[in-house]
């Protein structure tokens, strides 16, 4: 699947644990246009074709440009840098490690197309 050239480093793929389901999640480290992290949900449609949709966006955190490395000064923000995702064994929760922010996020993915 091609998420688009701005989505760099799709590091983690996590399929549903339920063997009757044909969906999962992919964590993307950074969007080069705005420093957001992203999670895409992927699934097989009725015709057997694999599809994907961005379902979670994690915004960068604003920061003083003087505190940032040169590469990030123009953005004025710290990117979340999604480095790992894990799906709970009951397929209910997705855990997302945001290394750049030093945070772990939890999303309810009971409805994989509409995480909360």
Tell what function each PLM region has.
Residues 20-22, 90-92:
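Short coil/turn segments that connect the beta-strands within blades of beta-propeller domains
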Residues 40-60, 106-116:
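Short loop/turn segments immediately following beta-strands, especially the blade-tip
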Residues 9-11, 83:
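Structural signature of WD-repeat beta-propeller blades
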């Amino acid at each position: 699947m091609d998420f688009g050239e701005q989505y760099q480093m799709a590091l983690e793929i996590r399929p549903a644990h339920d063997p009757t389901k044909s969906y999962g999640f992919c964590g993307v480290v950074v969007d080069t246009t705005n420093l957001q992290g992203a999670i895409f949900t992927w699934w097989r449609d009725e015709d057997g074709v694999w599809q994907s949709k961005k379902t979670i966006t994690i915004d960068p955190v604003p920061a003083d440009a003087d505190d940032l490395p040169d590469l990030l000064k123009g953005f004025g923000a710290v990117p979340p840098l999604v480095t790992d995702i894990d799906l709970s064994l009951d397929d209910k929760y997705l855990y997302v490690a945001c290394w750049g922010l030093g945070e772990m996020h939890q999303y309810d993915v009971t409805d994989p197309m509409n995480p909360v």
